[in-house]
Structure formats: C-alpha cells, structure tokens
Amino acid sequence: MIIKENSDKQTQIYNFLIEFTKSKGYPPSVREICQAVSLKSTSTVHGHLKRLEKKGLIYRDPTKPRALEIVELSNEEKELIDIPIVGKVTAGMPILATENIEDMFQIPINYVKHNNDLFILKVTGDSMIEAGILDGDLAIIEQKNVATNGDIVVALIENEATIKRFFKENGFIRLQPENKNYEPIIVEDCSILGKLVGIYRAY
C-alpha cells in the first residue's frame, strides 16, 4: 500500500494510517509507515506523528509504543458483528456446531467484507509469521470447503486444524508454512474448513 507522491509527508502518513487501519483492523508500525511514504528515518516519522497528535487527529498511548488511535475512525459509528471463536475442530462435525464454539467475539463490520459464515481460530505457534500471522492472533476465517492455489486456509489434518498456504500440485496437496524453519505438509487429500479473510491482533 503506497501513498501517492502528490501530497506532503504528513498528509501521506495520515492517509496511510487510515487506509492501513481500515484494511487490517490495527495500526501500522513505524517501519511500515517509513516504507509506505518513502522515508528512511523512523525519527522523522515519530516527528510527524507528534504533530498529528498535537492537531488532535491521532492519539497515542505512551505506555504502548505501537498503540495508536485515529480519532476520525474512532468517531465513526461502528456496526459490530459477533463471530464465533471455535475452540476445537472435529472430523465429521460441522465447524460451527454448538459444542465447538468457545465464545463470541465482536468486531466492527467494516473490518471484514461480509459476515456470512465467519468463524475465528486463535493462532498458536509461529509457522506463518512471514505472512504476518503471529502467535496469539485471532484468525478470521470464511467457512468454505474449496481453495485456490495460494490461498491461506484452515485445513483439517488428522483431526487437527492447521493454518497454512494451500497448493494443489501433481496429484497431491501441499500445505506450505510461511516460516523457513518449517517443512511443508504433503498429503493426498485433506478437508478445507475455510479461507483466511482477516487477522485481529490486540496490542
């Protein structure tokens, strides 16, 4: 996500903050801001953020370095949807069976494209860190049983759900981690439970 060069850096940064936060559901890091607006110095970005805060456009929590709130977005009326958090996945049982659901989680509806057949799995482990999916994240999944090569999916392998990138090739399915320290999972077949459509991360 790169901001056009036809505005000053402060405006570019503010526009990027809004775009990124609307898209991801959480604010960008200072380094991500640097990359988006072609600045090399993180201290320059911090200076712009201070000026935006003085103007009342953003609010930063001094106790949490990455915690940043965009006042404009906070003031928008947010329609919330409830998404079930699935604690376990069992072969032969519908993913949203009552006994599988641990809790419900509310998120603004604008964080996802729709609220049809969504569920949440809590990410455990670091096998997908190079795709920006971290341990403890809440993975928002659209329930579906088919996938296209390159999709990040939830697959059921030996009665255990795993989040990996999907590839079908040479009569086999490759479930590819996004971490060079992990080997791909190669299987003849597997059950696809859904496709990743969003990540929610608390700071």
Curated annotation (Swiss-Prot):
Enzyme Commission no: 3.4.21.88
InterPro entries linked to this entry: ArsR-like_HTH (IPR011991), LexA (IPR006200), LexA-like (IPR039418), LexA/Signal_pep-like_sf (IPR036286), LexA_DNA-bd_dom (IPR006199), LexA_repressor (IPR050077), Peptidase_S24_LexA (IPR006197), Peptidase_S24_S26A/B/C (IPR015927)
Gene Ontology molecular function: any one: serine-type endopeptidase activity
Listed SUPFAM superfamilies: LexA/Signal peptidase, Winged helix' DNA-binding domain
The reaction(s) this protein catalyses: Hydrolysis of Ala-|-Gly bond in repressor LexA
GO BP term, pick one: proteolysis
UniProt-annotated site: Cleavage, residues: A91, G92
DNA-binding region: 30-50
Alphabetically ordered keywords of this record: Autocatalytic cleavage, DNA damage, DNA repair, DNA replication, DNA-binding, Hydrolase, Repressor, SOS response, Transcription, Transcription regulation
Active site feature: S127, K164
Functional note: Represses a number of genes involved in the response to DNA damage (SOS response), including recA and lexA. In the presence of single-stranded DNA, RecA interacts with LexA causing an autocatalytic cleavage which disrupts the DNA-binding part of LexA, leading to derepression of the SOS regulon and eventually DNA repair.
Similarity annotation: Belongs to the peptidase S24 family.
Assembly with partners or alone: Homodimer.
Name listed for the protein in its UniProt record: LexA repressor
Gene name of the encoded protein: lexA
